[in-house]
Amino acid sequence: DTAIVLKQKVDAGEIVISENTHRLVEGIFDCQDLRVQSLKGITPPINAWRVRGERQTESRFDAQHGAGLTEFVGRGDEVELLLRRWERTKSGEGQVVLISGEPGIGKSRLTQHVRDRLANEPHTRLRYQCSPHHTNSALYPVVSQLSFGGGIAAEEAPSAKLDKLEALLTRGSADLQPISPLFADLLSIPYSGRYPALDLTPQVQKVRTLEALKDQLLGLASQQPVYMVFEDLHWID
């Protein structure tokens, strides 16, 4: 039957999904079409996909709208408010805006539209995606953003990951020696061949990591304005 045929196409522990499920998650997960041919008593051919892993995207919004967006309509007052705050940011006054409301009203779309409006202005863009599945993972949005911003893939060798991490950190810091081990440890990247081990208590390491993150952000902001968005803030750790 169908289950037996699909079992022959995948290895133990792999995940196979249907066509309907694939349509819902194709922007979030990397899937391979199994191309199962017609079987006796089964018409048309089976449409099934093997899930190969999670796609590296900046946010849930980007994953769900990778194919493109419709024209942005309305929200003129909100857009103008955010752009006025951006002008104040460029003059050196840091701004914080909370966008709240029921799911589906267009909060992420609003921030995306403002981001598009800033496309021709010099700035640094940071987007942090909080998740209900990682509320117990310390600094998950930061870890995810660093991995995405540095183009660090899970399957890469530790040396390649460190190279990309260092390239990312140079954007906000001149001295990488004291901070690279902290960031590498945060991203679970082995670094023993390049940096000495951190001889710190967990509490001290936590404090220094937070300080390094703050200094990195300040370093970026000293060069040009930073447009930073936290998605689904209520799920932050």
For each of these PLM feature ranges, what is it?
Residues 1-237:
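Key residue(s) within conserved catalytic/signature motifs
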